[in-house]
Amino acid sequence: MKWCNFFNKISLILQALGCAVLYFVIEAICRHSFTEAWTYMTTRPLVFAYNAAFIFTTMLIVYLFRKRIFWRIFVGSLWLFLGIVNGVLLLNRVTPFTGPDVKNLTDGLSIAKKYLTHTQMTIGAVLLGIAVLILLIILIRSPKYRGKLKYKVNIPLVLVGVLAFGGITQLALEKRVLSNYFGNIAIAYEDYGYPYCLATTIFNTGISAPRDYSKSEIKRIEKSEENLPETKEGSHPNILFLQLESFFDPTLVNYLELSEDPIPNFRKLMKEYSSGYYKVPSVGAGTANTEFESITGMSLHYFGPGEYPYKSILKETTCESAPYVLKNLGYTAHAVHNNEANFYGRRSIFPNLGFDTFTSAEYMKDENQKNPLGWTKDSVLTDEIVKCLDSTEGPDYVYTISVQGHGDYPSEPVLENPEITVSGAPTDELNNKWEYYVNQIHEMDDFVKELTDKLADYPEDVVLVMYGDHLPTMGLTVEDVENKYLFQTEYVMWDNFGLKKKKENLAAYQMAAEVMDRVGIHEGNVFKYHQARRNTKNYQVDLETLQYDLLYGKQYTYDGENPFERTKMRMGIYDTTLDSIQVVSETDHTYYIQGTNFTPSSQVKINGEWYDTVYVNPTKLIITGKELDDF
């Protein structure tokens, strides 16, 4: 009894120590290493202490109950469960467990199927069941606090603890112990700790209402655009954007030595056409966010830390974008991506951005042309882009997202005879990563030449903007790169009709407006804003207000009603047709399927049943295993 009284008196201290140990275990799980967790704790002690205090604060509710041991174990188990979920996810993807994932937990089974085998799911379900059973036993058999529960004291003290932690959070942000801007969400989780980053991505989302937000303020912003000229009449050129995965100039890395220039074609184009640095919202990851800025003209800076609008607001509403704006001028909007359609949820998001067609890897006949990591090579994109241009009589807007340069880059040699060799990195493992990466972007550079050569002879006017979406995941620091800035790649604005060359650095959210301005198009609220207000006073402040109004506010810009309807987007450019079925072998029920526009992803379903399908070529498939009675 004396021991119980003693432990009750020092329960806060014991709880704090327990939370620190629990947090260390969580970080070890997330980092897949106790050594890395120890390094993190010893090199960033203030961040570690803050996150341990976060868990401690959530555990203060135990003082409102008698079964305090149970509630400590229950709250601790929830944190441990979240840590395990993140650890498992990071075994299968680069992005950690974030707010949007929490909101999708109701679809937990489908998420589990995506990342776990059937056996792993079974083991996980059994372990979860055992954990729940243990918690129930603890609930029934754990001792109760025998003293008097003083709610009039305990509740205010818990609230004081929560408020004090809020003050600590604000102080940590002011002193830059923490940050509320995540350039790379994976690195942010490593730098600022799992509890803080998870909570931030859950609660700090969207764009906060500006203090002076009102209808009159929006009208004032609109009035500042009045001096823009009208959109020129007549025909308009095809507008193409080519977003190159992790593409940047490795000669800018101070320590690298390369056997030859890996991007001679891109470099040549930069000298001959408009070019400059391209400011992007993230480092090492975040393709979809560079994409969002380039398509909509909106800056990610005003959204929540690490937020992906593709996973938040764009699931709920349409958004003003280049496809919607150009549609009013007769453009057809196409998206092209040599990866699966559901990557970043693009298949469901692109209709909310106004795209008319989406050609993903599943709709490409050459999707099986893979690099050593299994990503489809970018060379397959040339024909797909030209197909988009050929499919309509009027002008086209084509947004292409490449994938060949995607990581995670191998630390062991995987190329037998690399065309370009690399040295100078601090370790052999990093040299191997750079050598693999450099040879991939060298092939991407060849693709750039192939595409521009093909478009040079195209019978319609074309302007093509090419740029890297972010720097590669190589652990680069500002000291490592010649330009001393990690949030930028380079772009070139190529054309086949003689646009004047211009050297200018631009942000991703400014590029679409710049292209439209260069070809005489002055449409769209966001794009006109950039054209009229860039480099003027309060440019960023008013941009934040405008973005808030369009996505989260009362939409004064549209007189209170969003004018953009979700498009009925089709997958692929041309229909897939089935023309005939021929018997190959009656003994094992093998048949030829004749048709058009088949790809390696084609699957045959007849009368509600799926058949084993083998791709032969774009006009022929083989199905087998089941007898067809009537065809």
Predicted regions, residues:
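Transmembrane and membrane-interface helices of multi-pass
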Residues: 2-188
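Membrane-interface micro-motifs in multi-pass membrane enzymes
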Residues: 47, 99, 185-198, 284-285, ...
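Short secondary-structure junctions and interdomain/linker hinges
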Residues: 68, 88, 115-122, 142, ...
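Residue-level preference for non-acidic, small/hydrophobic
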Residues: 108, 239-244
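N-terminal post-signal-peptidase region of extra-cytosolic proteins
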Residues: 118-119, 224-226, 317
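Membrane-interface segments at or immediately adjacent to transmembrane helices
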Residues: 169-241
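Solvent-exposed soluble domains appended to multi-pass membrane proteins
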Residues: 228-234, 244, 249-622, 627-631
